[in-house]
């Protein structure tokens, strides 16, 4: 029977690898160049401003810390790459590095056979934890990678009888998560409760002190942009206080719009709990990841603020650590665990409602504006060419217009700009003397009127986003 189990696992691995080879090109940027999502454009802008000497804390980011900006500045400095020259692929490389670290977590599990570790890592890599945003230029991938590694390092340092100071490495990983988003403080509280219930013996004063020191060291360093922005700690405090208003539904509440994904995650976690109960045995530190994942899910389920990105942590905890540990044992247990994790990942992909994508033709906007600028400056060599954007949720326009001087809002020279972007609220095009009006679809449900100085004709092409 054991031999049959090995053969079955081998066949599962072969099927998986073949699928990987067939489908991997579908994720290639060469076939479908990626478009920057609005939230990614916000993070790009904040990181660019920070690189230009603007303290991150003055941006009043309501949700996130500067961890992504610090990491991006470091990588771009090492590569000699300027923010204005960065492509979407360049930006997404930053969270990709952390996603690779996340995929490596199953390989570091103890008490799990190597074939199962490898299958778990490959499954996570292949389906991106059932989430399309694992490679996005956002904070969530850094947060989840830091937190999951913190859980792993804490458990390994305790289970292997290492000195107390090894817990400091877990704290450092948690510090990364804390500098990404204040919600990490709640996650840490849930993990502490899980340890109290499952593995209280690991919570010694010395280990806790070392973990706290590591978290404070890395968290403060990142939150202050490597100790150059002392107000970053104050900003984190403001975000923490504000988080209670968000949690209570009194500020920035997002209602549930994708129940299918939440149901899929809830059923998956419930099945893992049932599997753990069927295994019986006393509670141990190996149960802490499952308890933490369930706690995080229930935490967000109880609060009015709902977005699928909030489930990235419990999903990754379950796929990196929980199911491989529960599946270890007989061949049928391993096969059932792998099949269940694969099925959940595929169901997640099918049920997860994707964001409102930026229209593909926006990639051609810089080329169109650049050609118009050349003609306009030839006709008006003594005047300054600039773009004015007034109103609306205009992201990701700043990224695609980064080669031009752009002003936002109602500034004195906005009405005289050679190129003006106005929010389109109805089908009646504005008639402004001295301008020709075009329509621009930024993304579904979001259109702009683009006004161009009529002293210079626009050379339109078939791929122009202006209609």
Which residue stretches match the model-derived regions?
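Transmembrane-lumen/periplasm boundary regions of multi-pass, lipid-linked membrane glycan transferases
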Residues: 32, 36, 42-53, 64, ...
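Short periplasmic/luminal acceptor-recognition loop of GT-C membrane glycosyltransferases, typified by
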Residues: 63, 366-415, 421
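Short hydrophobic/aromatic helix or loop-helix immediately within or flanking a transmembrane segment
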Residues: 60-83, 93-97
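Transmembrane-helix motifs of polytopic, lipid-linked glycan transferases
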Residues: 93-115, 149
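Membrane-interface transmembrane helices that cradle and orient dolichyl/undecaprenyl
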Residues: 112, 150-167, 177, 196, ...
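Specific aromatic-rich, kink-prone transmembrane helix
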Residues: 142-159, 170-174, 293, 317-321
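Short acidic/glycine- and proline-prone juxtamembrane loop motifs at membrane-interface regions
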Residues: 88-91, 129-142, 182-183, 307-308
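Transmembrane-helix signature of polytopic, membrane-embedded enzymes
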Residues: 6, 106-127, 144-145
